[in-house]
Amino acid sequence: MNIQWKSNYFEAIDPKEARRILDEELYGMEKVKQRIIETIIQINRTHTLPAYGLLLVGPAGTGKSQIAYAVARILKLPWTTLDMSSINDPEQLTGSSRVYANAKPGIIMEAFSMSGESNLVFIINELDKANAGKGNGNPADVLLTLLDNLGFTDNYMECMVPTVGVYPIATANDKSQISAPLMSRFAVIDIPDYTEEEKKVIFSKFALPKVLKRMSLR
């Protein structure tokens, strides 16, 4: 696997540029934007990523994933997604030992390989589904090793990946379903639902123009 091991030193990020990106990507959400700017200021102070990630909690359709993409854009990092609702076996994350015929690396190691570098944003969708393991252990326990910044070991590759350059951004609908150890790894941002009028504005001024741009109709 071709992975470039990068320094976890972060150059200063212009808060005004960060705000411009947030305004371009998100409608309203003033408290959310301010919380993200505070995180950027902290990064500028230490030149490292915070020891905690962001947990975005709110109903479906409130732009949680879009917030995560905007943060990755501000940090100028590649991003990858983990959909916890589709993961029911820890080996899907950690990989399986080479002693087995169908052994292969786990999703996390594959994400590092696809990004080509060790510094990236992990967008963990539906974190509140992470405890739904079936028989072979709890996927949430694997996430804890990824979030601890002590390095992540894949069972297939049998090597440790530095994780100090990983910034996790998780989404959830119901934070009461998330274990206390996992919750302790995140700063929680509650995302309020949009009104019907706000949804119309978002569709006409944000969603539709982006779709038309992708289709080259603008």
Regions found by a protein language model. Name each.
Residues 62, 85-88, 99, 127-130, ...:
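Conserved nucleotide-binding/hydrolysis micro-motifs of P-loop NTPases
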Residues 123-162:
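Conserved catalytic/switch belt of AAA+ P-loop NTPases
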Residues 7-8, 116, 174-184, 188-218:
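Conserved C-terminal "switch" segment of AAA+ ATPases
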Residues 74-104, 111, 198-199:
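AAA+/P-loop NTPase substrate/partner-engagement loops
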Residues 49-84, 113, 180:
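Walker A/P-loop
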Residues 48-54, 118-120, 166:
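Pre-Walker A (Motif I) flank of P-loop NTPase domains
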Residues 2-57, 108, 208-209:
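Pre-Walker A (pre-P-loop) alpha-helix and adjacent loop at the N terminus of AAA/AAA+ ATPase modules
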Residues 99-124, 155-160:
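Conserved alpha-helical scaffold flanking the Walker A/P-loop in AAA+ ATPase domains
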